[in-house]
């Protein structure tokens, strides 16, 4: 097994993810179409999940990314309301961010049944990045 880390090297909008075990790059006509990854090497406890997500959101905010579609998909936060929503296996959390007219991303947090630790609440984070589609 080998783990990878995304270093998004845009001079203005760059950020770095934690190590990932799941990491895919999509191509069309030999050009990168998008990246999909899970910025973790195993399903995480809720506290650890929030640390990863909040760090990524801080990096994006500091690099000039802005949250979009916030009426329906507000940024994640470490609040009792968000914790309850993430614990609900039928809800989870999704956020969208945009970097000018260049890029968009979607981050999803989902409850995950981990057969290695069946008595623990574990979570998966999925991150997808692609060129901006103009969604505000």
Placement of each model-derived feature along the sequence:
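N-terminal leader/targeting segments
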Residues: 1-31
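A generic structural signal for beta-strand entry/edge sites
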Residues: 3, 29-34, 92-94, 122-126
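Generic recognition of long tandem-repeat/solenoid scaffolds
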Residues: 6-9, 13, 95, 125-129
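Short, surface-exposed beta-strand/loop "edge" segments at domain boundaries and coil↔beta transitions
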Residues: 15-17, 42-47, 102-106, 132-136
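Long, charged/polar, surface-exposed segments that mediate recognition or autoinhibition
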Residues: 19-91
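A mature extracytoplasmic/lumenal domain signature
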Residues: 39-41, 71-74, 101, 109-111, ...
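Aromatic/basic-lined ligand-recognition segments
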Residues: 78-116
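C-terminal basic regulatory modules in eukaryotic proteins
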Residues: 106-136
């Amino acid at each position: 097994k080998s783990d990878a880390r995304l270093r998004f090297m845009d001079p203005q909008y760059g950020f770095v993810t934690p190590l990932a075990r799941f990491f895919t790059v999509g191509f069309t006509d030999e050009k990168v179409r998008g990246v999909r990854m899970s910025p973790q090497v195993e399903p995480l406890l809720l506290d650890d999940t929030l640390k990863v997500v909040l760090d990524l959101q801080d990096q994006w905010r500091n690099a000039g990314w802005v949250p979009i579609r916030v009426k329906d998909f507000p940024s994640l936060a470490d609040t009792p309301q968000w914790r309850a929503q993430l614990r609900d296996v039928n809800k989870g959390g999704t956020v969208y961010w945009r970097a000018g007219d260049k890029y968009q991303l979607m981050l999803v947090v989902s409850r995950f049944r981990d057969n290695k630790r069946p008595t623990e609440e574990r979570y998966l984070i999925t991150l997808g990045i692609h060129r901006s589609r103009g969604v505000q």
